[in-house]
Amino acid sequence: MTKQSLPDVAKETHSERFAPIDWVGMGAIELPVMLKQADGVYRIPARVDAKVSLDKKPSRGIHMSRLYLLSQELLTKSELSLGLLGTVTSEFLRTHEDLSTKALVQVQFEAPLVRKALKSNNQAWRSYPVITSAFNEEGQISYFVEVVVTYSSTCPASAALSRQLIQDGFKQNFSTDKPLDFDVVHSWLGTPQGIVATPHAQRSFARVKAEVGANYNYGDLIDIVEEALQTAVQGAVKREDEQEFALRNGQNLMFCEDAARRVKEALDAKADVLDYVAEFSHVESLHPHNAVSHISKGLKLRSF
């Protein structure tokens, strides 16, 4: 059987049978993408979603192979950028001009970034989950970046309760009838009896999605979130780094509501962040459940 005579049931058209479909395509296509780093461009594994609408004329299906081959051709040979994703969506529509008015491409990967230690001269690699995407509706393209930042959150309520216990311990160990000896008190504070309680803290996650321009770098969004929260988890840690981390946690006590408001304030101050939605999950060490909060700019992005 020749190629010309191979059947293609996707081309069947029966208006009474085939209703329009919002999105159809492929999810989690396995592709390597070219990611720019400070010292060069490297191939990293990624998962790609490639979709178009099926809404121009009644048809049983789209051209799946066209989406796959275009994704493979364009995304594996050029440096990954939002502008490149916009080009991909334009090609999706060009090859489906008789079928589709909208196209979407989404690339999910782990971004390796070098982070400096808090105090020492060390640095460490961190891996950040990132999703970059482009949405094209009849030539109008929107760009999005989504990141997940891991941070530490120390409970303000637990901190207050711990301070009260420390005060009680001080009262029990030092009489008001005698003058306090600075050296004795200073030494006592350095013992387990001096700091008898500590507040509960936990690893926490900020998931942030932003609408941005075509030239935006996902690393900038990660930096904004980490700077707002101040307690991003660390890689290489010496004692001076761990002490600084303890200080930052003590100076940045956070409920999940506090984390949300901090990041909202930081994002609202950035003109190149057009819209955003974010959720915060504190994986509680006190409870078997998480404490969660959700914010948005209040425009189009209201959920992920």
From Swiss-Prot:
Sites marked May be catalytically important: C155
EC identifiers of the protein: 3.5.4.16
Gene3D superfamilies: Urate Oxidase
Substrates-to-products reaction catalysed: GTP + H2O = 7,8-dihydroneopterin 3'-triphosphate + formate + H(+)
Enzyme superclass (EC): hydrolase
Keyword Hydrolase in annotation: yes
Sorted UniProt keywords: Hydrolase
Pathway: Cofactor biosynthesis; 7,8-dihydroneopterin triphosphate biosynthesis; 7,8-dihydroneopterin triphosphate from GTP: step 1/1
Superkingdom in the source lineage: Bacteria
One of the GO biological process terms: tetrahydrofolate biosynthetic process
GO molecular function, a single term: GTP cyclohydrolase I activity
Pfam families: GCHY-1
InterPro entries: GTP_cyclohydrolase_FolE2 (IPR022838), GTP_cyclohydrolase_FolE2/MptA (IPR003801)
Function: Converts GTP to 7,8-dihydroneopterin triphosphate.
HAMAP family in the cross-refs: GTP_cyclohydrol_B
NCBIfam families: PRK13674.1-1 (NF010200)
Similarity comment text for this entry: Belongs to the GTP cyclohydrolase IV family.
Protein name in UniProt: GTP cyclohydrolase FolE2
Gene: folE2
